[in-house]
Amino acid sequence: MLRAIFYKEWLKTRWYYLVAVLLSLSFVGYVLLNFFRAAGLKGIAHLWEVMLLRDAVFVDLLQFVPLVVGLLFAVVQFVPEMQRKCLKLTLHLPCPELRMIGAMLLYGGLLLGGLFAVSLGVLFVAFRAVLAPELVRHILLTAAPWYAAGIAAYLLAAWICLEPTWRRRLLYGAVAACVLRLFFLAPAPEAYDGFLPWLTLCTLCTASWSWWSVVRFKEGRQD
C-alpha cells in the first residue's frame, strides 16, 4: 500500500519536482559560479580573508530558496486533493487513515530531503576543493537552518491545505508564519549552531499537525 501511495503522489508532483530540482540546483550553481569567478579575479586567498574578517559565507542568495520550494511542493501535492474531493476517497482506502496521511507527508519529506541533501552535497564538494574544512563547515552550518525551514514550510503548508475551512486556514497561516520566522531570526552566520537540534525537533513536530486538519475534514467541518 505504501508503494501505491507513493506512486499516486508521484503522478501528482513529478513535473513540479523536476522544476524544483532544476531551479534549486541552478541557484546553487549560480552561487558557486559567482564564488569561483571572484576567486579567479581576486584570488582564493582574498576570499579566505573576507570569510575570516567579515564573516562572509557567499551563499546568502540561497536563504529563501528551500522555503519557497517546500511551500509550493505542499500546494501542488495537497490542493488538488481538496479541490477534486480526492481526500475523501483516499481516506476510504483499506489502510489506516493516520498511516495514509503519514505516508503522503513522508513522500514529500523524502523527496525534499533528498533534494536539499544533494544541494548541500554539491556545496560541500565544490567548496571543499578550495577552502579549509572549518570554512566549509561554517558555510554549511549557516545554510542548514534554511533547508530545515524548507521542510517545515512543506509540513506547515500541508497542514493549512488539508484544513477544510478558510477561517482556520487563515489562523493556521498566521501560526505557520510565526513558526517559520524562527528559522530566520538571526542573520549572523552559524547563529543557530546551538539551537539547530531544537529547530530540527520543531520541524518534526509540525508533521503531526496535519492530522488535526484531517480530523476536522472527517467531521464535515466547512465554512
Regions inferred by a protein language model and the residue ranges of each:
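Helix-loop-helix units of permease transmembrane domains in multi-pass membrane transporters
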Residues: 77-107
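Hydrophobic alpha-helical transmembrane segments
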Residues: 1-64, 76, 80-81, 162, ...
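Secretory targeting signals
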Residues: 24, 28-32, 36-39, 43-70, ...
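Alpha-helical transmembrane segments of multi-pass membrane proteins
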Residues: 7, 11-15, 19, 98-115
